[in-house]
């Protein structure tokens, strides 16, 4: 139909990191199979940072090192140091704040995060494992992928 517009996305990536540039190209190829037009903007460090800070992107490939307490505040809180492109008033951010204040539980936050999906982790450089007796998990995890069924974990 002539009146239909094709969905078009711009992915911003730092060209100085070959792994991230390759990831952006791979995502582009996958999305184009779904008939989504994708432009990958491979930028030098200075231009990349400026593009991300300005919000002139649909997606960006970035890297975040979480603090030892695994706080998502830099991503989900208003004024967070890496909250680029994230609606810090959205459902995930609101649920995270409620969880931190103790007025809501972890499952409610996870459900809101999954529905809102403010960011998508593409990979993890190193994994950690924690355990509490209240954690109930399936048996699909494996030594090479301890988070394989994280979406089914529950706290009781």
Locations of regions flagged by a protein language model:
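Ligand-binding clamshell of periplasmic/extracellular solute-binding protein-like
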Residues: 60-73, 125
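Glycine-rich loops and low-complexity Gly/Arg-rich segments
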Residues: 35-37, 63-67, 83-88, 145-150
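Ligand/substrate-recognition segments at binding pockets and active sites
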Residues: 1-66
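Short, low-complexity, polar/charged sequence segments that are solvent-exposed and flexible
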Residues: 28-34, 60, 78-82, 139-144
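Short, solvent-exposed loop/turn segments at the edges of secondary structure
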Residues: 4, 55, 70-71, 87-94, ...
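Extracytoplasmic/peripheral linker and loop segments enriched in polar/acidic and small residues
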Residues: 39-48, 73-136, 156
């Amino acid at each position: 139909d002539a009146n239909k517009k094709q969905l078009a996305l711009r992915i911003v990536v730092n060209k100085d990191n070959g792994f991230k540039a390759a990831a952006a190209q791979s995502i582009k190829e996958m999305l184009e199979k779904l008939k989504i037009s994708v432009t990958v903007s491979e930028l030098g460090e200075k231009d990349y940072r400026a593009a991300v800070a300005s919000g002139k992107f649909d997606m960006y490939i970035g890297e975040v090192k979480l603090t030892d307490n695994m706080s998502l505040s830099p991503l989900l809180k208003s004024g967070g140091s890496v909250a680029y492109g994230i609606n810090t008033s959205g459902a995930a951010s609101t649920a995270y704040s409620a969880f931190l204040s103790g007025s809501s539980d972890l499952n409610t936050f996870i459900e809101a995060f999954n529905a809102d999906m403010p960011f998508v982790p593409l990979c993890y450089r190193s994994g950690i494992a924690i355990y509490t007796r209240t954690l109930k998990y399936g048996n699909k995890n494996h030594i090479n992928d301890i988070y394989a069924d994280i979406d089914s974990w529950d706290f009781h």
